Amino acid sequence: MSSINGIDNIKFDYEFSNSLYYRNSIFFSIIFFIIYKKSSYITENFFGELVKKAYTTLTEKKKLEWDQRVVSMIHAFLVLPFCIISAVESFKYGDIFYFQNDSLLMVLSISSGYFIWDLIICYKDPKLVGTPMIIHAIMGLSSNIYVALPHGRPCFVPIVAILLITEISTIPLNMKGFIQVVNSKSKYYNWSLGAFVITFLVSRCIIGLPFDIYLVYGCIQRWDVFPMDKSLVFITECGIQFFLNSYWSFLLIKKLYQTYLNPIPNHKKNED
């Protein structure tokens, strides 16, 4: 144990390996590309006739969306356990702004590999994913690489893992997308929709938005401790993330209002 400018209870005996991080990131990006390329084969051969029939009737654009969901789902399942472990250990050792261990290295490696894949997909077909998702991919990769740079490390490293816990909403979102294609009238569609709404609003809005503000405040409190360039990048990305989560939360709440709470009856038309 040691202390840096008043930051106590931090483990400094862990050696972060740059070469291992870069190798792992490339390895996982290759894995995600392989899954993406083989997604159609996996879907048509390992998920039963009902799923196969639904998938084969999709347009090429819809098939690409399905394949992207497969990769997104696998990334969420892979990274979430390491995010939770990292978050618990970061809180345990006293400062979520400054900590590093094997779990955090895995979080950075898996998510960097995913964001490399994601950014290339966005570059190849930007109209398919949309501007907000392109910004999301750029932010994800740039923040991962920047916190892994040697100067000032491990400042902000734990926060990457904590913020990626919001990927928990990705799982029901993708399940909703899969079920909508296979059988939109299934009771599981409504269950997955409800799970998505709850996990998204709780993780990204109710907790996420105040947490973004806290992170900026915490960064300012440590202004003299961490490298200025990393602090500026961190604050900028927190601001963009706050905007994106606010925007997505607004769209979701608006959709819920229009669907369930719209005060104007749908049958009311052309009254005299």
From Swiss-Prot:
Annotated signal peptide: none
Task: Specify whether Protease is a keyword of the entry.
Answer: no
The UniProt record lists the TLC domain at 61-261
Q: Which InterPro entries match?
A: TLC-dom, TLCD
Keyword Lipoprotein listed? The answer is no
List localization entries: Membrane
Give the stretches traversing the membrane: 16-36, 71-91, 103-123, 128-148, 155-175, 196-216, 233-253
Keywords assigned: Membrane, Transmembrane, Transmembrane helix
Name the predominant localization.
membrane
A Gene Ontology cellular-component term: membrane
Q: Identify the Pfam families for this entry.
A: TRAM_LAG1_CLN8 (PF03798)
Membrane topology, as annotated, equals: Multi-pass membrane protein
GO terms of biological process kind? lipid homeostasis
Q: What family is it from? A: Belongs to the TLCD4 family.
The name this protein goes by in its record: TLC domain-containing protein 4 C
Identify the species of origin: Dictyostelium discoideum
